[in-house]
From Swiss-Prot:
Keyword Protein biosynthesis appears in the UniProt entry: no
One GO process term, biological-process aspect: ERAD pathway
UniProt-recorded name of the protein: Endoplasmin
Higher taxonomy: Eukaryota, Metazoa, Chordata, Craniata, Vertebrata
Modified sites of kind N6-succinyllysine: K1, K230
Organism for this UniProt entry: Mesocricetus auratus
Subcellular location: Endoplasmic reticulum lumen; Sarcoplasmic reticulum lumen; Melanosome
Primary site of residence: endoplasmic reticulum
Modified residues (Phosphothreonine): T379
Name of the gene encoding the protein in the UniProt record: HSP90B1
GO molecular function: ATP binding; ATP hydrolysis activity; ATP-dependent protein folding chaperone; unfolded protein binding
Disordered: annotated span: 346-400
Amino acid sequence: KKSDYIKLYVRRVFITDDFHDMMPKYLNFVKGVVDSDDLPLNVSRETLQQHKLLKVIRKKLVRKTLDMIKKIADEKYNDTFWKEFGTNIKLGVIEDHSNRTRLAKLLRFQSSHHSTDITSLDQYVERMKEKQDKIYFMAGSSRKEAESSPFVERLLKKGYEVIYLTEPVDEYCIQALPEFDGKRFQNVAKEGVKFDESEKTKENREATEKEFEPLLNWMKDKALKDKIEKAVVSQRLTESPCALVASQYGWSGNMERIMKAQAYQTGKDISTNYYASQKKTFEINPRHPLIRDMLRRVKEDEDDKTVLDLAVVLFETATLRSGYLLPDTKAYADRIERMLRLSLNIDPEAQVEEEPEEEPEDTTEDTEQDEEEEVDAGTEEEEEEEQETAKESTAEKDEL
């Protein structure tokens, strides 16, 4: 398939349109004409392809194209160009290192600032809160999933704007951008989300951490020993009881889903992958009633099977809330059933009632009925034969 639509003229004489890399792949939708007075006419097309001046032309073509795209009016750009070629621009950020800064200014994303309109990174930076030094983003399979994630709860409550990444290529694109306008990007589903706090707020946080230390240690060393890296008091949760947070170099839930889908298509096993095998941080909300009750129960009896079950159920629901997949859904369903039994005061050991055995059908009456029908049928046949015999005898007498 043809990937370049650039025609080359030398001194207004058509030379060729058979190029393979005059424009990068992400700009394969651009059509144009190049006329040069500096290229030689008396050389073969193969030699011309390797001419050093073509490298300069290629570089200028890309920059001219990006400048031209930048001049498109915002309304027309957002409504028309971005819908058609937005993915191309994102791929350009990933592939074209030399023009990454120019391409970043052309990016558009959904954000918490507006329910329908898309925003540029320039507009996001203009709206940033005072002392905010990072651009916050949340990735998900849809806007609804991203904005309902536990990771954005406190950010939205405090009035921070969050960019929503809803396409598979989005997270790759942002990872390729080290920063924008001096502001680094922060995935809110990973470690590193911090807020400015006063001395009093800091003291309260430290007191809370000390209060919940028995529960945090119990989770890390006993209940969730093989499942998490550590358990900490969360600064990002306001409504949810807990969340599962990836390290800075680990995969978010969205990225893990994408990688697993790609591995499934290629037949690769990612279970041994360094990023996939990294344990995550379990963050708890100290103000949530479930967490407070767990702290009380652990202090009373840390070997209570019900509390152990509850800790694992919380971990598994946090896994789902945080966008990850559960490796063992049956075990999760069994634990939920045990919790339901306890809440309804049903004996955990109560078994399912056995189905009643099917009784054999009573065939005695049917057999007697069949015999009666056979007898009746036989009697009728005998009567018919007697009537026919009588008729024949009468006929013979009449003849005599």
